[in-house]
Amino acid sequence: MSETPLEYRYRTLPREELTTRLAAVTLVAFDVDGTLTDGRIGFVGAGADRCLFFHTHDGHGIRNLREAGVSIAWVTANRFLGVTERAKSLRVLYLIQGRQDKKAAIEELGIPWQRIAYVGDDENDVPSMLAASVAFSPANATQPAAVASHVRLQLSGGNGAAREVCDLILRAKGLAPFVAPDGVVWRKP
């Protein structure tokens, strides 16, 4: 018996099931390169760390999720000082760098996969995506990651895809943005 080619294994969920799963999420695990960034890596000069760009909208979405009680993990096979600094500035709870087996790294956190949403864009994300309750892929994801996802996002990695995920989860939890005198807050309507 031959295996079905990956391109035919699209995973879809009915809207009600997707909303139920998103409402139950307690941890969102993000791949970094190509998901929180656009996937490009720049080199500024000799001995310099790599240059990565993160979108401010994504950062605000991550803060909103954290303030709503959802834990955040960043999981990357690389080690970049810029990733560490950005994660610290957003108070990311779990920063996992230098791990090729992202699924095993997430399992070490002890959180059941039924409570985890995963956002990935490439082949090394697929095992985590297949295990997660809900898997997202940015618009610019590779075909294997896109096929392994439940939700193909409208925005690209590093250009608002993470914010799109955050807003979907917050809405599934019954929260909506309100303009308050001191800024926008997410709360129950």
Region locations from a protein language model:
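Substrate-recognition element of Asp-dependent hydrolases with the DxDx(T/V) motif
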Residues: T35, I62-R86
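Feature captures the catalytic cores and cofactor-binding loops of soluble hydro-lyases/lyases
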Residues: L81-T84, R99-A105
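Asp-based phosphoryl-transfer active-site loop
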Residues: L22-R40, M129, A162
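Mg2+-dependent phosphoryl-transfer enzymes with acidic/Ser/Thr/Gly-rich catalytic loops
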Residues: G47-H55, K88-L90, Y94, K103-P189
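Basic, amphipathic juxtamembrane/active-site segments
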Residues: R40-R63
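Non-catalytic pre-domain segments flanking phosphatase-related domains
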Residues: M1-F30, L175-P189
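Short coil/turn segments at beta-strand junctions that form active-site/ligand-binding loops
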Residues: A24-T26, V70, Q114-R115
